[in-house]
Amino acid sequence: MELLAASRACIFFGLVTVLDAWGVQQVELSEGAWAMIDGRDVLTPTNTTTRVTKAWTFLETPPGCAGDISVKKVCVSHSLCEDNIIIGKHCNLLTGEHGIALAEFNVVNGSLRRTDDVYFVNGTVFPILAETRSVLQIHRATPSIAGVYTLHVSIDGMMKHSVVLLTVKKPPKQPQPQPRLRVKTPPPVTVPQVPVKTHTDFVVHGYHSRVYRDGESFELSVNLESHIVEPSFSAEIQWYYMNTSSSSCDLFRVFETCIFHPTAMACLHPEQHTCSFTSPIRATKILHRVYGNCSDHGNSWPSRCHSTLLGNRLYFIQPAQNRVDLLFKDTPASATGLYVFVLLYNGHPEAWTYTLLSTANHFMNVLTDVTRPRLGEHFYTDLGHKIITPHPSVATTEELGAWTRHYLAFLLVIICTCAALLVALVVWGCILYIRSNRKPYEVLNPFETVYTSVPSNDPSDEVLVFERLASDSDDSFDSDSDEELEYPPPPKPAPQLPPYQFVDGGDAPSGRSGFKVWFRDTPEASPVPLHKPTLQGPDYSRVASKLKSILK
């Protein structure tokens, strides 16, 4: 913008904006109106275009200067004339131009693609920077939004501008109908009826973000407007704080539903609790003002009614004179976070707003979400454990240990179960191994093997052969036949070797077993039997054979 000062006697001085092809728009709105203002930035990227940057800026019109601002055509030469904004000399323009939106785009396949954007909005003006169009959306216009809105577009370093001069005027009053005069009857008197509100209404207007420097002082205002119909009421003004300096979220959400239902389970234990503001119970209360019995119905009731100040206020935060806003003095970098204002009327939340205060390094996007947050998969069930945002002046975090105890108990149960299964598998394997090596028909003999004679395979040696008797009824053990048993002659005694004789398998004649046998040096004399067996004694070999065959 250029400031024009007349060297001769002139009646005005002007603020001139040098524009490119898009010119100046003059928009006039009535107070409370809604509007959509086009920025007229029709862009056609060329083949050489690589980067496009768009920005909205705002220059506020000082109070009392609305009538001294106009749009006129200023000619630099005979062939170059452009529209410019002229401000009269009676208007003291001391305000600065502020950025309210910024977006960066890249050109991909001949079209724009958004890469980064940031918006500084309040509840009335919503700047929009899109790939094809840029607009200003006005909700319920107020005199405070009047001023000059400039759209800056940079295409590979070449700047273009589009200016909107916005003025807000009060709606014209409706003319009162004149009563008709009649000769015979007196004219009726009509009294205009003023609509009376039957309910209490609170409105807040404030910016949702502010970037500050370390050590800066400023005021955080919510612009509270009140309309109260009850003769007496109670109210509470609460300020909450949530630290966002350590958050790595691309988008921070503020759930409006949880402001009105702070004790809901999904609000107390939300999903991604570090990236959202849900229940005020999870935040730190930095200011709490209670009004017990107030009967003032104007907008100044917070400062006129008696109140009690509670809460642990920070050393760099002071309550403003109107007892609603906050004054920040020598603000440190640790004060970065989300500050939420809540107004309770007769115990119920009626109005709320938020502002993100941050340094340039910790700035993030904040979005208001009117849905219910999702419940976290693992939320804290012990009522003694509270989730509280740490104090902004103390750079400490509160460790949450409930989940550690739960996971350790779960891990211990798994280890015990695995150990029990392992022991059971080992026992079962041993049982299978014993069963596989066991002989089902083996007869266990507790006695050692005893040889009664020297083993030999000489056919001349008699060998006791156990034969199973034929299954004949005549030969049965229980047979009643009187047949006499035939007793064969007794066997001849085997020749005895002389003492100290060594039998070697190598010198043994053919047909021998080949066993090596050692005898004692002094052979023991065989005991003399008590009864000398008779030569013709009975032979029980057949009976023994039958018994053995039966026992076998």
From Swiss-Prot:
Q: What is this protein called?
A: Envelope glycoprotein E
Family according to the record: Belongs to the alphaherpesvirinae glycoprotein E family.
Topology check: give the Virion surface ranges. Answer: 24-410
Key word Secreted present: no
- Which residues lie within the region annotated Interaction with gI? 65-91
Compositional bias of kind Pro residues: 487-498
What task does this protein carry out?
In epithelial cells, the heterodimer gE/gI is required for the cell-to-cell spread of the virus, by sorting nascent virions to cell junctions. Once the virus reaches the cell junctions, virus particles can spread to adjacent cells extremely rapidly through interactions with cellular receptors that accumulate at these junctions. Implicated in basolateral spread in polarized cells. In neuronal cells, gE/gI is essential for the anterograde spread of the infection throughout the host nervous system.
Residue spans, topological domain Intravirion: 428-552
| Originating gene | gE
Residue ranges under compositional bias (Acidic residues)? 473-486
Q: How does it assemble?
A: Interacts with gI.
Main localisation: virion
GO-annotated cellular components:
host cell endosome membrane; host cell Golgi membrane; host cell junction; membrane; viral envelope; virion membrane
The signal peptide annotation in the UniProt record is 1-23
Source organism per entry reads Equine herpesvirus 1 (strain Kentucky D)
Q: A Pfam family matched by this chain, by name?
A: Herpes_gE
Tell me which residues are glycosylated: N47, N109, N122, N243, N293
Q: How does it sit in the membrane?
A: Single-pass type I membrane protein; Single-pass membrane protein
Region feature Disordered, mapped onto this chain: 473-515
Question: Per the UniProt record, which residue ranges are transmembrane?
Answer: 411-427
Task: Write out the entry's keywords from A to Z.
Answer: Disulfide bond, Glycoprotein, Host cell junction, Host cell membrane, Host endosome, Host Golgi apparatus, Host membrane, Membrane, Signal, Transmembrane, Transmembrane helix, Viral envelope protein, Virion
Give start-end ranges for motif Internalization motif. Answer: 451-454
Region described as Acidic: spans on this chain: 470-478
